[in-house]
Amino acid sequence: MSLATLQGQSLDFAVKHSLDDLLKNPVRFRPAVVSSPSVPEGTYTVLNNPKQSTVSRKSFSAPTSPTRNKRSGSSSQEYKKSSGTRGDGANDFVDEDPAFIPPARILFPEEKLSMEWDNIMPNAPGLVNLGNTCFMNSVLQLMTQTPPLVQYLLSGQHSLSCRMNACVLCRMEQHVARAYPNKGTKRASAFKPSGIQSMLKVISSHFRPYRQEDAHEFMRYLVDAWQKSCLQNHKNLDHPSRETSVVHRIFGGYLRQQILCSVCKKPSNTYQALLDLSVDAKGSSLADSLKHFVHAEKLTKQNKYRCENCKQLVDASKQMTIYRAPNILTIHFKRFTFNGFQSSKISKQISYPESFNLGPYMSDPNCSCWYELIGVLVHAGGSTRSGHYYSFCKSSNGVWLKFDDDFVSNSSIDRVLNQQAYILQYKRKSTSSSKHKLNTENTVTKTSNKKRRKISF
């Protein structure tokens, strides 16, 4: 008998007995319990994820009124580090409504934030494409036309105290200084955004030079890196203190998730910090997308909710609303869907207004919170790894400009409103009633001895 035949028989014998052993002693699996959907580097939390379990998660809830009721059952993460707060060394959760937790330290006073342009600035210049960097250029142009951010960076406040060797916010400060080199009316010449490109690996380790990336993903990691820069001189800060950084003052807000028991009608409120809103692109308008975002989901059948008040699994409703509105509202349309290793794009037109009231989508529907459009980022192409990004931005003199890498041209509001938008940037209108405050359903109490609870996962 040949050696090959013996080896073949040995292999057949081993396979047969391995299968027999497996059938006699099968591997027993159990459902995994995860704290959030899997995403790159574990930074961001997917909102309204239809596959997300609502029963088997560790969680906590916040009081539903100023009387600070006892905790009731909840089934999702809340008041958690949002995108933009990673890297500060804290994974603790707090047990209370953000209205009841005064910050131990104020990093950036709210009254110093300037929402309107202090001066008419020269129009920002174009940015040279360094090789598949249109995703970066289009985001940088949006940020370079955001009044509170630009005016903070031009003041040079951050670099005066920064001690980081590789600081993304310092590089952004330098970038803005190049875009607005003087207070004259002459536009600067197009330049290479090499300072930001050289920080791609710092912004996120999976970014590669000269490779097309997703503009929204880059934006979120960029803002996240700015937040790290804001916190680098401050250790062991509580959540409320971290969220008084200039980054959160500009882009930050809160979501509220409310689960309402169908039996006892007792609500369970949980809160989460936000830096942008990602909404579905299935409707025909921004209003459709926002309505879908705040639409109440039924928890029933295999997805019932365990109510701590009723001490049993019950039918319930779950609704996400905006609890505190940000000063700069960034809205991302989820145009890309992924199936295995391929992605496809929802290319239909979605209408959006020049101004709108966010009030109907807030936790208190009686609130009035008006926004005006200041930027639109567009993706032309069929997937995140191909195509081209460009943006439309409203300049300090009210003129709309199109930024297509190093080419800058005048535009109009009619043309701006007729784009296949991927990202919208809105600025909160300055009125006496639209200050950066928590939703009025709760009253902020300025006490320093509030009990805080940390829960580790």
UniProtKB/Swiss-Prot annotation:
Sequence ranges of Polar residues compositional bias: 45-67
Family annotation (InterPro entries): Papain-like_cys_pep_sf, Peptidase_C19, Peptidase_C19_UCH, USP_CS, USP_dom
Region (Disordered): 34-97, 434-457
Catalytic activity, EC: 3.4.19.12
Catalysed reactions, as listed in the record: Thiol-dependent hydrolysis of ester, thioester, amide, peptide and isopeptide bonds formed by the C-terminal Gly of ubiquitin (a 76-residue protein attached to proteins as an intracellular targeting signal)
Comp. bias regions, Basic residues: 448-457
Domain spans labelled USP: 125-429
Keywords: Hydrolase, Phosphoprotein, Protease, Thiol protease, Ubl conjugation pathway
S-S pairs: none
Pfam family, one: UCH
Example of a GO MF term: deubiquitinase activity
Modification type Phosphoserine: residues: 61, 65
CC annotations in GO: cytosol; nucleolus; nucleus
Domain of life: Eukaryota
Active-site residues, as the UniProt record annotates them: 134 (nucleophile), 388 (proton acceptor)
Residues the record lists as Phosphothreonine modifications: 64
A biological process term (GO) from this entry: proteolysis
Family: Belongs to the peptidase C19 family.
Descriptive protein name: Probable ubiquitin carboxyl-terminal hydrolase 16
Organism of this sequence: Schizosaccharomyces pombe (strain 972 / ATCC 24843)
